[in-house]
Amino acid sequence: MSKTKDQRTAKTLERTWDTLNHLLFISSCLYKLNLKSIAQITLSILAMIISTSLIIAAIIFIASANHKVTLTTAIIQDATSQIKNTTPTYLTQNPQLGISFSNLSETTSQPTTTPAPTTPSAESTPQSTTVKTKNTTTTQIQPSKPTTKQRQNKPPNKPNNDFHFEVFNFVPCSICSNNPTCWAICKRIPNKKPGKKTTTKPTKKPTIKTTKKDLKPQTTKPKEVLTTKPTEKPTINTTRTNIRTTLLTTNTTGNPEYTSQKETLHSTSPEGNPSPSQVYTTSEYPSQPPSPSNTTN
């Protein structure tokens, strides 16, 4: 009955919780709308009431859960105390096992057993025996022929120092007590197992290829001197004419006289050497010889 009541209360609390959550959501949505002041006030009051009721419901729910926990713990404690007070007797009917009645505590009274009827088929069928203690009755069902499994004989644990028999092929000195021949042959072994030797392989050096150089002396060729030939200029025969004009001088008598005209012609030979100048003197009037005063060199 108590379980059904607890379930009902839990369901009612869940329903109230859900309804209050829905109401709070609806009131918050309505409050966002621009309503009149009276409606907003009523919605705010309703939201406050719903929130307080939610808090109260949560407290009730937590309290009921704690009550359930305390009830279960009390039931467990009662059961353990009853188990401690009761001392069941272990009954066996097989005389081969050599087990007799044994009471675990001296405080309990002697158990009353009801003997089972002896029939020829009693050995094959299981028999039930009832044992009465202070206020509790326990029934025990025991088979007539218990199955016994053969236990596997485990090998004895080897001592820690016996590892050398498997590893080494010689006689350890721990065996020799007073035998001199044994002491002559045996070898002392450390207590700890020998660790693996770390072998470091030598790193191969990189092979450097060497090319044999020619032992013949290198013949150095002399550098060729670049000779620049002068470019031959074309020979151009140029004639320079130095014409000196004679100034017309008028005599006091009024007869004009022409002075001699000198022409110098300079010609260049193909080798570039200038030729001697030739001077030509002419006179306009052959009848009159040129006077030294009028001629100009």
UniProtKB/Swiss-Prot annotation:
The chain crosses the membrane at residues 38-66. Disulfide bonds join C173-C186, C176-C182. Residues 105-139, 235-253 have a biased composition (Low complexity). The keyword Transmembrane helix applies. Residues 101-161, 190-297 are annotated as: Disordered. Pfam families: Glycoprotein_G (PF00802). Residues 1-37 are cytoplasmic. Residues 67-297 are extracellular. GO terms for biological process: symbiont entry into host cell; virion attachment to host cell. Keywords: Disulfide bond, Glycoprotein, Host cell membrane, Host membrane, Host-virus interaction, Membrane, Secreted, Transmembrane, Transmembrane helix, Viral attachment to host cell, Viral immunoevasion, Virion, Virus entry into host cell. Residues 211-232 have a biased composition (Basic and acidic residues). InterPro entries: G_prot. Residues 187-198 are annotated as: Binding to host heparan sulfate. Belongs to the pneumoviruses glycoprotein G family. This is Major surface glycoprotein G. The gene is G.
